[in-house]
């Protein structure tokens, strides 16, 4: 996630190119851990271009899309594969109790965000984002994606907790996770509003695909096929009991920092 709490460091070059950079972080337990930096630039009358410089602590290990979109979801069928690959869960089982971690998982059927939060409500974990299905490979083709058998890893919209700014562009409301005190519709409305604003006001690579995503969401509503959660490692282990969750992948691990 991009840190929106601080003012970005911006500059305008002699050639009228706007440049800025922002910290990128992940929620691991109750900490926001810096994992990189976003660099964005826009030439006068040109496209907005950006790149993310990752602070990867490991050699020869690239970050990859952690969510699986199975062909069955595109065809309206239920995934019949083994829902619980053991890799991430085996790793969690070897961690000491005094740790928190970030865990990704995919979902066997398309679900509303409310349904996912209800499934998670029995566990002491926090959901920080969800992978949104917006018609990719079903209603329209994508320029780039990867696949392995019936599984697709695609660029996707991400549902995140709502962020709100005041009249002076200062941050007035900020959540790091989806709270039961806030209606999920508020977060969904922000997602739609953000995509509307971007496609109307910014030229960027992929804008045509986002216009199609927006049309799909307006017609069909928001459904998700994956989520990211964080919490104590013992609580994360319990998620393997949920039949709807599969393809678990372990993210960052930190020492205990949980309320």
Model segments located where?
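Terminal interaction modules at protein C-ends
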Residues: 2-20, 24
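Intrinsic-disorder-associated interaction segments
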Residues: 5, 48, 181-184
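Residue-identity detector for threonine
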Residues: 13, 17-20, 71, 86, ...
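Extracytoplasmic beta-rich ectodomain segments of secreted or membrane-anchored proteins
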Residues: 25-26, 31-168
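Extracytoplasmic/luminal low-complexity segments enriched in Pro/Gly and acidic/polar residues
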Residues: 172-259
